[in-house]
């Protein structure tokens, strides 16, 4: 089992370097095979050296492939963890948002409870008599509850109704002041009639400017009468 040592270069750089080395060794190998045998040099020795170098490069490439596989697997796990962390972050953000909404709602409930507690303590310090409450409730019931049917109980005609009746209107202030309750009343201006102030128009006389150094020229006078009799006779 080959033991892979940690490399100083990243996997892509190591792979490119290994493939370049193998390409050079293969080119050298093909050159040796294609060249004619030289009696001065040992071709077999050179072939053995190139073969050994190719074998070492192949083993190194195998280790690089395994290392790249481990690297890709680790990167895949890293991406999964990253997505998992992103999902957890979204959940945490949602929980924090709901906690903030709950905190605001709880603060509102606490404030409302404090106000209710103050009202309760105030009512305990200053209690309202029962007679006052009953009188207030009875006065409100006339306007908030429906009238009792005559089939269930006799109707008290002297009971105050929440709406004005015809008799109460006839006994009101308008009837006492002898106001007319039928037909159209007198029409006119309410209150004393006030005359509108007259606007006085100030007329300014036209000021004629005379020039003393200007001479009178009779030929410079134009006839401005457009409807003269002379034009009709022509």
From Swiss-Prot:
Pfam families: Med4
Main subcellular location of this protein, as a coarse class: nucleus
Keywords, sorted A to Z: Activator, Coiled coil, Nucleus, Transcription, Transcription regulation
Gene expressing this chain: MED4
Organism: Cryptococcus neoformans var. neoformans serotype D (strain JEC21 / ATCC MYA-565) (Filobasidiella neoformans)
Subunit structure: Component of the Mediator complex.
Protein family (similarity comment): Belongs to the Mediator complex subunit 4 family.
Name of the featured protein: Mediator of RNA polymerase II transcription subunit 4
Subcellular locations according to the entry: Nucleus
GO molecular function: transcription coregulator activity
């Amino acid at each position: 089992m080959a033991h892979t040592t940690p490399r100083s270069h990243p996997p892509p750089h190591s792979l490119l370097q290994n493939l370049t080395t193998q390409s050079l060794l293969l080119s050298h190998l093909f050159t040796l095979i294609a060249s004619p045998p030289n009696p001065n040099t040992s071709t077999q020795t050179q072939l053995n050296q190139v073969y050994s170098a190719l074998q070492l490069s192949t083993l190194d490439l195998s280790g690089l492939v395994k290392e790249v596989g481990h690297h890709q697997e680790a990167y895949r796990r890293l991406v999964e963890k990253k997505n998992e962390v992103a999902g957890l972050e979204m959940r945490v953000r949602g929980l924090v948002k709901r906690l903030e909404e709950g905190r605001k709602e709880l603060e509102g409930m606490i404030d409302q409870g404090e106000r209710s507690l103050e009202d309760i303590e105030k009512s305990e310090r200053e209690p309202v008599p029962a007679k006052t409450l009953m009188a207030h409730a009875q006065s409100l019931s006339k306007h908030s509850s429906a009238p009792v049917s005559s089939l269930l109980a006799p109707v008290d005609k002297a009971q105050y109704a929440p709406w004005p009746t015809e008799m109460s209107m006839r006994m009101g202030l308008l009837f006492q002041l002898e106001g007319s309750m039928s037909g159209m009343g007198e029409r006119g201006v309410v209150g004393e009639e006030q005359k509108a102030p007259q606007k006085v128009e100030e007329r300014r006389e036209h000021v004629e400017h005379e020039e003393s150094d200007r001479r009178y020229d009779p030929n410079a006078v134009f006839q401005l009468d457009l409807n003269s009799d002379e034009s009709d006779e022509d």
